């Protein structure tokens, strides 16, 4: 027994023996027969071993139900032997007519679901008194072995997992917020979840391989799966609709929301404040499942209570004031991640090169550090960023291969630095946050284009093009033709006309061209 498979987990394993009869399966006879018949119809002719693989049903249940379907004329054996597992069955005309009605009502084909009652009880057993957790030192050490620095952040993350309370992480871009939060699930014990559950004849999907990583040891009943604590990451794409469980008619299942998929693990709302929907609405939607550890989904309009024992984590590049007091109470622990030290960024850069199995001249490490050292020390004075370290290492690999070299030298590094967009923008002293502001494009008609151009540049305009007796410029969205005309008049620049020709988001391309 260990942290990832304790006595409680072993007891659950013993309880999850594969059912051998319909009563223990806790699914209706009609549901089981309908599932089998849909599989036979979809294949046309199929071997019973394939039906067994798809449904996860015990051979006793499978043989009993297929035999009954055969007797009622819905399917017929077409080949096989004395072994039931090698018999092939085909759908009959009568069976095909029967399947039409079943599939219209419930098109799901797959592993047999678990009953709602069994799901609820098993989850309740696992989540009862889950916190506080005693995390072994070996688990902590293994979890953070590839995390450089940020000792204070590690402590807060550990404490969040011990007591099961939410955490709020904020700070400048590139400081590793998402990365450190992604380590939290490794601190938590695993759990067992159903792949699917049945409620009112409908199927709800719980297991999602995109978020749920299987453990090596699995229960005997294949309808259940033991997973490591999940890490469910949502970002700017998150919307109110995505926080709900929605029906997928193509699969014939209700697909659970991130709130439910994160049960037993971490739900990270990344880039808080960047979502299309108001972040206040999103946070308000999370309050009930965070507080009650349960959420409600609707199946045919009927409310179904499901478990949502997740630890909420929020990250943002914005200020902590983006969350009000009611929301912060659900995430009482906080971490401010400042820009890392130059030495830490260099260490991450070196680690990434080694992970990429790149050989390199040692002098490139000093040159890389020089990018972030202060100008007083002879450096470029750029803001240190863990994200830069990873990206530049990968770009170095690309440049080295493209140049046909065997190792990364200063020349390769210099070219890689010159190709990293954020490093280039910092060198140009361009604030990326300002680039998204709207601009107005003006057509300015003037007799003396040279004098008018200089006056517009002095005003802060960005010259785009000239056409005949006009100049096309970009200015801030708040500038009006009257204000611009008044300014040029005071500069003794004769203007024949000013008109707004477009309003748009400021383009990075134009910013770079104007440098």
Identify the meaning behind each predicted range.
Residues 145-313:
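Conserved ASCE/P-loop NTPase catalytic core
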Residues 280-283, 323-355:
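Conserved AAA+ ATPase core "coupling" helix
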């Amino acid at each position: 027994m260990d942290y990832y498979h304790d006595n409680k987990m072993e007891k659950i394993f013993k309880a999850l023996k594969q059912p051998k009869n319909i009563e223990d399966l806790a699914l209706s006879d009609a549901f089981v027969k309908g599932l089998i018949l849909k599989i036979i119809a979809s294949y046309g002719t199929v071997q019973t071993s394939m039906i067994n693989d798809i449904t996860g049903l015990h051979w006793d249940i499978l043989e009993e139900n297929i035999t009954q379907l055969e007797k009622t004329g819905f399917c017929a054996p077409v080949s096989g032997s004395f072994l039931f597992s090698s018999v092939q069955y085909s759908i009959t005309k009568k069976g095909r007519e029967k399947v039409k009605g079943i599939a219209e009502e419930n098109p799901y084909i797959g592993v047999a679901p678990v009953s709602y009652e069994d799901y609820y009880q098993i989850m309740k057993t696992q989540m009862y008194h889950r916190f506080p957790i005693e995390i072994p030192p070996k688990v902590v050490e293994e979890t953070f072995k590839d995390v450089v620095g940020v000792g204070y952040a590690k402590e807060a993350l550990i404490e969040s997992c011990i007591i099961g309370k939410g955490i709020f992480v904020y700070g400048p871009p590139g400081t590793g917020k998402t990365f450190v939060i992604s380590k939290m699930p490794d601190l938590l014990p695993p759990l067992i979840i159903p792949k699917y559950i049945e409620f009112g004849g409908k199927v709800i999907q719980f297991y999602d391989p995109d978020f749920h990583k299987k453990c090596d040891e699995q229960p005997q009943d294949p309808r259940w799966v033991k997973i490591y604590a999940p890490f469910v990451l949502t970002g700017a794409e998150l919307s109110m609709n995505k926080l709900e469980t929605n029906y997928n008619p193509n699969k014939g299942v209700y697909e659970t929301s991130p709130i439910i998929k994160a049960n037993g693990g971490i739900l990270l709302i990344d880039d808080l404040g960047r979502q299309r929907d108001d972040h206040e609405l999103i946070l308000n939607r999370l309050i009930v499942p965070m507080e009650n550890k349960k959420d409600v989904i609707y199946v045919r309009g009927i409310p179904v209570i499901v478990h949502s024992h997740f630890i909420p984590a929020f990250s943002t590049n914005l200020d902590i004031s983006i969350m009000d007091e009611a929301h912060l109470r659900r995430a009482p622990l906080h971490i401010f991640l400042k820009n890392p030290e130059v030495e830490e960024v260099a260490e991450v850069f070196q680690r990434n090169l080694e992970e990429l199995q790149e050989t390199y001249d040692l002098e490139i490490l000093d040159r890389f550090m020089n990018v972030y050292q202060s100008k007083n020390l002879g450096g470029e004075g750029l803001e240190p960023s863990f994200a830069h370290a990873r990206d530049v290492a990968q770009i170095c690999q690309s440049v080295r291969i493209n140049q046909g070299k065997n190792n990364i030298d200063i020349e390769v590094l210099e070219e890689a630095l010159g190709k990293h967009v954020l490093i280039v923008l910092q060198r140009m002293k361009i604030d990326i946050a300002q680039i998204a502001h709207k601009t107005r494009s003006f057509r300015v008609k003037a007799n003396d284009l040279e004098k008018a151009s200089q006056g517009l540049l002095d005003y802060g305009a960005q010259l785009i093009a000239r056409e005949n007796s006009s100049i096309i410029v970009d200015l801030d969205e708040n500038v009006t033709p009257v204000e611009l005309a008044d300014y040029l008049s005071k500069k003794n620049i004769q203007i024949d006309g000013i008109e707004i020709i477009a309003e748009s988001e400021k383009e990075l391309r134009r910013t770079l061209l104007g440098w």
